[in-house]
């Protein structure tokens, strides 16, 4: 719950390189007039980025414009105006730039609908319209842009169903249609996107099942459908997709058990986000074979049994969330986690862990910033070795059976902001050193007083 993530990872840096295109000095009146109309449609240009778009210079030298010069054509091939807070609807005259291959209009304030004449841009390869306030439906006529390799419409206000026609884009490598109000099902035709590497449909209102053929996409590296209403099970074909590095299906209505061999069939896995679904069963021991795993979220489910003691074999693990399950009672796996020297966040809250907190807990990574044990049945005194975790920002140990005094070693927590120890059997008065924790803004100690610092 504390570490719940809906990861929308910035894979653009991993999988996409913006091209460098040679600028020449051609002339083409059709393109010039289209650019003039585009400028006229802009009502807000706070950085004056379009001030060069005038007759004082040849339009091939206008800011954000790239030309190519060939034997037959001297045409605009790229429009790059990303991140300048430009405002207005996107001019339909952009469709007259028929040699456009690249459109970078992300991170602006464009609104209205995506021009329906975009299919005239049949040479289009990359289009970034993410981080605007565009509305309406995703144009099905985008399927006519058969050379499209990248379509990124994330973070807009689009609605309606995802066009099944997009499944015909055989060259498409990245498709991001996340953070909208898109409805309906994931089109089965997406199983035909034979070149797709990144498929992100997160944070919508999609329903139905995951199409089985998604698991047959041989190049798929990143798959995200988090925060929808997808139900059913995850296709076995997806579990066997060895190219996958990131799987994010958290906050849906999926139900299943994890395959025993998941760590063997997904050896390149780096991120596994399964939180807030209806999965059950044991946590597979084979996960330790996914040696590149960095983030593992199995929270808010019905996982049961013991936590594998070999998770310490994951050298790059820095985020582990096992909260809100039926795991327990042994905490022996904590000793193994001391090998995870990059561990930054650990959430074991709301399970059935019992017994005393092992002394090796103080040998967890010194990079640890968040540690949560609350709502378990852990007893005994708080080990003084916890004081070794000097970079803690959040520590939750509430609603357990801890006894004794608050260790004075907690004085070392000079970065601590949130400290929950309520609902235990702690004794004594509020330690005076608490006043020296200058970053602390929430201290909860109901057994010996409640204070907000």
Please state what every model-predicted region is.
Residues 1-452:
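Plant-biased, solvent-exposed loop and capping regions
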């Amino acid at each position: 719950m504390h570490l719940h993530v809906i990861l929308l990872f910035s894979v653009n840096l991993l999988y996409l390189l913006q091209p460098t295109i040679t600028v020449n000095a051609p002339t083409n009146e059709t393109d010039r007039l289209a650019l003039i109309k585009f400028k006229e449609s802009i009502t807000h240009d706070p950085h004056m980025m379009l001030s060069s778009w005038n007759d004082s210079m040849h339009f091939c030298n206008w800011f954000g414009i790239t030309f190519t010069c060939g034997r037959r054509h001297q045409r605009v091939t790229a429009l790059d105006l990303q991140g300048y807070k430009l405002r207005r609807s996107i001019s339909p005259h952009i469709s007259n730039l028929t040699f456009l291959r690249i459109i970078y209009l992300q991170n602006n304030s464009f609104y209205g609908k995506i021009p329906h004449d975009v299919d005239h841009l049949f040479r289009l390869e990359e289009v970034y319209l993410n981080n605007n306030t565009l509305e309406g439906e995703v144009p099905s006529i985008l399927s006519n842009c058969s050379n499209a390799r990248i379509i990124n419409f994330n973070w807009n206000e689009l609605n309606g169903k995802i066009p099944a026609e997009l499944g015909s884009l055989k060259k498409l490598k990245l498709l991001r249609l996340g953070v909208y109000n898109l409805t309906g099902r994931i089109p089965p035709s997406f199983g035909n996107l034979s070149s797709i590497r990144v498929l992100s449909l997160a944070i919508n209102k999609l329903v139905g099942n995951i199409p089985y053929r998604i698991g047959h996409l041989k190049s798929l590296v990143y798959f995200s459908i988090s925060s929808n209403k997808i139900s059913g099970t995850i296709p076995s074909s997806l579990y066997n997709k060895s190219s996958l590095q990131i799987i994010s299906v958290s906050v849906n209505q999926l139900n299943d058990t994890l395959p025993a061999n998941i760590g063997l069939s997904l050896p390149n896995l780096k991120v596994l986000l399964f939180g807030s679904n209806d999965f059950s069963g044991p946590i597979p021991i084979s996960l330790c074979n996914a040696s590149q795993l960095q983030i593992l979220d199995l929270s808010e489910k019905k996982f049961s049994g013991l936590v594998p003691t070999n998770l310490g074999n994951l050298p790059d693990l820095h985020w582990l969330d096992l909260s809100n399950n039926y795991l327990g009672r042994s905490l022996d796996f904590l000793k193994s986690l001391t090998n995870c020297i990059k561990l930054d966040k650990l959430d074991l809250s709301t399970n059935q862990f019992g017994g005393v907190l092992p002394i090796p807990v103080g040998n967890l990574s010194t990079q640890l910033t968040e540690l949560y044990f609350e709502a378990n049945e852990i007893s005994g005194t708080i080990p003084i070795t916890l004081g070794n975790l000097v970079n803690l920002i959040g520590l939750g140990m509430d609603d357990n059976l801890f006894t004794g005094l608050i260790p004075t070693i907690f004085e070392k927590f000079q970065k601590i902001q949130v400290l929950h120890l309520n609902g235990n059997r702690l004794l004594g008065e509020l330690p005076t050193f608490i006043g020296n924790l200058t970053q602390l803004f929430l201290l909860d100690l109901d057994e010996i007083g409640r204070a907000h610092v």
